[in-house]
Amino acid sequence: MSNKKDVAVKISGGKKIREAREKVKSDTLYNLTNAVERLKSASYVKFDPTLEIVMKLGIDSRHSDQMVRGVVNLPAGTGKTVRVAVICKEEREEEAKSAGADLVGSTNIIDEIKAGKINFDVCIATPDMMAAIGSVARILGPKGLMPNPKLGTVTLDIKNAIKNAKSGQVEYRAEKAGIIHAGLGKLSFSDQDLLKNLNAFIEAVIKAKPAGLKGSYLKAMYLSSTMGASVQIDLTSIA
């Protein structure tokens, strides 16, 4: 049976949620600046939530020529600690370690992946290791961890790849319904830093518009915070 203290906590929590929801109007379109301000004022959780973006694109991702995918280097970073694994030959392991990689190796890492031990957020590989990594493609692929030259994670420039991954590089990929979702920093960031990240991400997605696409590309955009409110963005305010 709940005691009076538990009941008081539940009432207090419910009140905070109601007050937060009242600060955001579901039938209103916001520009990016106002959206960030509203989400901050409406946040009620005790942890530092992530600012999340959802973009609805007018594409059919079932067609190979309408795939939208890429990476963005966020100017203000993500606010997260990123664990980077580098799979390379022995002669380049020291270089990877010096550049800040958290996990460095070759077939030993591949064996760990096969055993289900995946304790990294980004996997970088040199081209000469890709044949061996192919044996774990079905494991890494669905998790979004498979090294890819288009994303800069299959490269000879190990140092720069590690730097990008650590400094706030975010991958985006349109899902079947043309939806792109990404976290773009912590709500504790300054408004200016969040807007820098938002503008960099939106610009990258817009530039990735398929050349042969007919009709409108950007259909809708929403911003939200973890366990918080969601606001719709006025697309006419996007430069």
Swiss-Prot record:
InterPro entries with a match to the protein in the record: Ribosom_uL1_bac-type, Ribosomal_uL1, Ribosomal_uL1-like, Ribosomal_uL1/biogenesis, Ribosomal_uL1_3-a/b-sand, Ribosomal_uL1_CS
Family listed: Belongs to the universal ribosomal protein uL1 family.
Coiled coil: none
Alphabetical keyword list: Repressor, Ribonucleoprotein, Ribosomal protein, RNA-binding, rRNA-binding, Translation regulation, tRNA-binding
Listed name of the protein: Large ribosomal subunit protein uL1
Protein task: Binds directly to 23S rRNA. The L1 stalk is quite mobile in the ribosome, and is involved in E site tRNA release.
Cellular compartments per GO CC: large ribosomal subunit
Lineage of the organism: Bacteria, Pseudomonadati, Pseudomonadota, Alphaproteobacteria, Rickettsiales
Keyword Thylakoid in record: no
An example molecular function term from Gene Ontology annotations: rRNA binding
Pfam families in UniProt: Ribosomal_L1
Lineage top rank: taxon: Bacteria
Gene3D superfamilies in the cross-refs: 3.30.190.20, 3.40.50.790
Any one GO biological process: regulation of translation
Subunit and partners: Part of the 50S ribosomal subunit.
Keyword Transcription regulation: no
